[in-house]
Amino acid sequence: MQDWLTALPKAELHIHLEGALEPELLFALAQRNGVTLPWPDIDALRQAYQYQNLQEFLDLYYQGAHVLRTEQDFYDLTWAYLRKCAEQGVTHTEPFFDPQTHTDRGVPFQVVLSGIQAALADGRRDLGIQSGLILSFLRHLPEEAAMRTLDEALPYRDAFIAVGLDSSEAGFPPRLFERVFARARAEGLPAVAHAGEEGPPEYIWEALERLQVKRIDHGVRAWEDPRLIAHLVDTQIPLTVCPLSNVRLQVFEHMGQHNVLEMLERGLNVCINSDDPAYFGGYVLENFMALREHLGMSQEQARRLAANSLASVLTA
């Protein structure tokens, strides 16, 4: 089934570019930029990829991002991800990037954006992969910081298809960012938001009602709220689910417990994504294969999941 899944056209709608930083590239960029790493070698870094929760992962994720310094670094990161898309039958991707992760350590916004944009343009031309970039705000930082990031981004308004909300979920409900999302919406930028991963179903309601999002990133805890499930079935708001991520971060103890196929059969608009593939052990194809192995996903279910992803893109 792997060859069939590889050939199946699909979109990826929940991928953090910084989370596609493979250990080999991380070490190469550290050497290029003279960055001293806390790990002696690639094997030691891989051994550090053990997390009990989202915050433990994020601590490592932000540490790894420190090697990204130049436009070429961001190009190389994005291009490596796009090559993986081409290998796995991903024909359209809408990646997130976290400018605050970089600007807060002195990397200019334009440096980050230029490298990513150049790679996405080359991906369209050379690999035939369509794409749209999502500007994500870090929810563990104050809304004022997100507003400053939006100010910095607006001169490049045409570079983005949407704004998003990510980072530590617990204790940082979507309502804290209502003003900055309203401002982005006034500028013509639609919204997506991470909700219902570690946070409760109430966070999904807030993202829908107060941030007016077009998609929910993760959303697996919607299953705990029958009224929310009925609403999501009725509205067909897409949920960008990331199975390997959910298991690695202990949202589910084992892939056999994951609810994504139950959600699909209930009529929810779910699709499969990799989230932070370098850190969670797989890209989109590996996520599909995990569902096949542990949940017995059928070809018909895989076809529906892929069709959902393509129907849920924000850019044509």
From Swiss-Prot:
Role according to the record: Catalyzes the hydrolytic deamination of adenine to hypoxanthine. Plays an important role in the purine salvage pathway and in nitrogen catabolism.
Cofactor binding annotation: Binds 1 zinc ion per subunit.
Protein name as catalogued: Adenine deaminase
GO cellular component, one term: cytosol
Chain sites annotated for binding Zn(2+): 14, 16, 194, 275
Cross-referenced CDD domains: ADA
Domain of life, per lineage: Bacteria
Entry binding sites for substrate: 276
Catalytic activity: adenine + H2O + H(+) = hypoxanthine + NH4(+)
Species assigned in the record: Bordetella avium (strain 197N)
Gene3D superfamilies associated with the record: Metal-dependent hydrolases
Entry EC no(s): 3.5.4.2
SUPFAM superfamilies: Metallo-dependent hydrolases
Family indicated by similarity: Belongs to the metallo-dependent hydrolases superfamily. Adenosine and AMP deaminases family. Adenine deaminase type 2 subfamily.
GO molecular function: adenine deaminase activity; zinc ion binding
Cofactor: Zn(2+)
